[in-house]
């Protein structure tokens, strides 16, 4: 679409309104549009966390699944939600745009939650209640009942992936970075975006969990379905006020193109002088411009990828013909190399989210056996997650007000701890949390054995579990912001969208690894002496926690080696005399 030339300050040349005309600053975008988008994010967080954090009690108490099976169902659901964000981001950047992606996937999410609600209403979609006289022989959910449940959960996960991948980016599209006033408003937008995430989280682990446990699952899930439909209606009502940006394509396409081109040219010989490789200068000479690309110097690492930039004259490739699947610029190759350099750091972040997964599964099962009463009020098991959220918020507040100033004063570094330092601390706290959880479980188990199998609620207060929730919250505040900062800073300018994908994929893989670990442990410990028993009082859950603690500790040591090896992009380029262009960050919640 060609844009008419104009000198009006109110007309934006890089954004359109819903009718395809250049966007008018006075009629589109700004806070009115952003507020409607924030509604979607708050409800998405409320729904995903509200279902996930309390799902294990539904699976064990209503569907009569074992603890290990229930834990894997929850972690697979949450892992899929995060992994599908990659698909949602690809679809939004390449095909549909962010607006349509949000609208379509929010409708899919609403469908999934509606089916989940119906499964709690229709008696035939859940097994009968246990007979008090034969409680050890509860009838498990049938294949059809589980099929409906999984359909509901994974439709919800699919919808979550599309919404989560697009909502922060579409919100930022409502502000013009080239205009100082709107640029400052964008910063406040991301603050409010994070606020909405936390509001949704707190409502999920308190009000929504209480409704599910004390009023009824049909009401708890029904509220989620209604909230999604309401938020989607508000979102669609703002259509004529939104600003729309052109499709930018997925950065994964560039990665794939470089790999394919390098493979096609694998038999060609690299020139001794890298200046003979195809680069942005050749495109500038042929086409007159190469917007958005800052030429990067050649590096000696991963030289096999350099073959993507070899001109193959026999294949008909010249400087005037640019097919990215047969010939990539050296700058494109160097950007992909930078992604490859980040992969060891990326990989060592995964295990922290395996620790986090325990809070929504086995820790909830632990809390069911403890005395959770405060006076006449009993805290729902899943509401223990409020201490995790509290640890996260407290750490964020202290870090902003104390740690940043302290680092500036002691180390002359104005941004607080460096990204890799925060990631390392987060991993340390993750291992510590699992060690604490193992010690707490030992105490809980000794008390259970002392009082015999007939005592369902042990004479131990819920406060015993607070440390493990709190420590994970502290660790997550550090590692999440550290990962986000690291990926945003280190991703090449032309591939900033990869930062979101790299972050969310560690969450997804962490949840999936938890499922794999539980399955392996269940297989090797058997039914005679299980670590994760259906009745925790007959298991050895503390051994599983020790296993996770040791794995995360070893992972932490590996991370220290990789972080010592890693050189920040800014320093590496400064050593060859290149100053980075100003690269705006893309904050994002999770």
Curated annotation (Swiss-Prot):
Induction / repression: By nitrate and auxin.
Entry GO terms, CC: plasma membrane
Membrane-spanning residues: 46-66, 77-97, 102-122, 143-163, 193-213, 219-239, 342-362, 374-394, 423-443, 460-480, 501-521, 542-562
Gene Ontology terms, MF aspect: nitrate transmembrane transporter activity; symporter activity
Compartments (UniProt record): Membrane
Protein name as catalogued: Protein NRT1/ PTR FAMILY 6.3
Family: Belongs to the major facilitator superfamily. Proton-dependent oligopeptide transporter (POT/PTR) (TC 2.A.17) family.
Lineage: Eukaryota, Viridiplantae, Streptophyta, Embryophyta, Tracheophyta
Role this protein plays: Dual affinity nitrate transporter. Involved in proton-dependent nitrate uptake and in the regulation of the nitrate transporter NRT2.1. Also acts as a nitrate sensor that trigger a specific signaling pathway stimulating lateral root growth and seed germination. The uptake activity is not required for sensor function. Displays an auxin transport facilitation inhibited by high nitrate concentration. Required to prevent auxin accumulation in preemerged lateral root primordia and young lateral roots when external nitrate concentration is low or null.
Magnesium among keywords: no
PROSITE patterns for this protein: PTR2_1 (PS01022), PTR2_2 (PS01023)
Signal peptide positions (record): none
